[in-house]
């Protein structure tokens, strides 16, 4: 693999030398919520081979985008985590998602891998919550055909920003839950949330969902006006 594939003295080319390879930005996206082990990254990136993932992670560690933490456990455990350099890419992911909403968004295609968490993990770079909105929403996605059968995410809105973590939050201000198909309808172009179960602060939960929907709606409007 060539270390500097573009060999051009320009800041965008220098940036693409580091993050322009296939899978790199998706790995950053999938580590936004916190460190992951190798097998966890394999789960959320099913299209990448074991050797490709190992090579890409090694390169990202060498480039200062990731840290690798080894634990003395049986079996051995290695965690990968974003560095400050990589966290500065979160707004870049948000801008890329904005572009995708405007020009490439739609219902899942035949054969396309569906991972609701992949959309939720974009929240820190994508969403700008309404002024004064503050609180946490626990979001649970269930799909019996997958392992594990349910995944739980916590989105927190505070000071005009949104953060995400993959954990349970029994004391969250609001709880949203539903099967994967319900989340696809809720986060897709139709923004149909009727099949999601809501408990707690409805205003907060709906505002965060609206933030996803607003991006899609705003993008669709911009596309129609273009």
Model region roles, listed by residue range:
Residues 138-192:
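Low-complexity, glycine/alanine/valine/leucine- and proline-rich hydrophobic stretches
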Residues 20, 72-95:
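Basic, amphipathic "hinge/linker" alpha-helix immediately C-terminal to the N-terminal HTH DNA-binding motif
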């Amino acid at each position: 693999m060539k270390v500097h594939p573009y060999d051009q003295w320009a800041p965008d080319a220098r940036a693409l030398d580091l993050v322009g390879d296939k899978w790199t930005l998706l790995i950053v996206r999938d580590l936004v919520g916190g460190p992951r082990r190798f097998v966890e990254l394999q789960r959320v990136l099913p299209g990448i081979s074991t050797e490709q993932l190992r090579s890409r992670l090694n390169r990202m560690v060498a480039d200062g985008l990731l840290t690798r933490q080894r634990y003395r456990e049986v079996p051995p455990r290695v965690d990968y985590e974003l560095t400050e350099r990589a966290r500065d890419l979160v707004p870049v992911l948000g801008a890329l998602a904005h572009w995708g909403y405007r020009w490439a968004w739609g219902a899942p295609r035949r054969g396309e891998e569906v991972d609701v968490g992949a959309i939720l993990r974009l929240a820190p770079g994508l969403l700008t919550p309404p002024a004064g909105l503050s609180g946490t929403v626990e979001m649970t996605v269930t799909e019996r055909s997958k392992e594990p059968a349910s995944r739980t995410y916590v989105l927190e809105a505070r000071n005009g920003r949104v953060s995400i973590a993959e954990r349970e939050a029994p004391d969250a201000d609001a709880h949203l839950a539903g099967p994967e198909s319900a989340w696809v309808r809720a986060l897709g172009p139709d923004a149909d949330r009727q099949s999601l179960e809501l408990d707690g602060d409805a205003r907060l939960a709906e505002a965060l969902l609206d933030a996803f929907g607003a991006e899609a709606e705003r993008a669709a409007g911009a596309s129609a006006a273009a």
